[in-house]
């Protein structure tokens, strides 16, 4: 029986042990659900990450893997991906001649990810059965990492629109922790303006929703910025929501990306990764296409 390509989950670097444990939990979940597929995960783009991507590659090779389908665990394409992820994979492949790999698309605002974001909002509002008016007086600030790449920032705006559609919230605004505007305080100002439409007897409130998969330094910076703004605006209720986390829906979305990557490049032959080339070859829906052929054409 032929062993299927291994699944390598690539998270953007964190030095936070909580983020590393969340990735481990997702890897365990996928391994339990799909025992036929070798699974590992690691971080790229940050020195001294607790789970280096290269170690994850080494571990899969030790388990007999010769082909890898790499899925970037990112809510949106970020600036470092076109360089940092292929570079990390190339360094790992140099240690393992003959290793083949192909890079799939990031998760983005996948419907299953949106389901988790909606659940995080309900949890922040107290959970349980809620009346439509509870959402109607709630404005959401969806906060992304922020990048120099405008396509990455546009993906956050797209996620905000999809999250708002049909869910009954007063509005969903966007902000970024760094490297892009609006920043968190400006985003909260915009949410406050939307909330001002609520009656004086039932004032509006803001839920700050991190568009991150795992906890880490970015989440801490976001919380500090939101808490500072809230302290300066005591009449506005500001509630912090949790990160997406290693949920079953995330595991399902990862497997969808895995299957699509294998189907697009069934042989997964040759050490190639289209993450760099994809920055200039985006699909019409805004998703970056990553193909081995594109990488072979100009990224050797």
Write out the residue ranges for each language-model feature:
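Active-site-proximal alpha-helix that buttresses catalytic centers in soluble enzyme cores
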Residues: 1-300
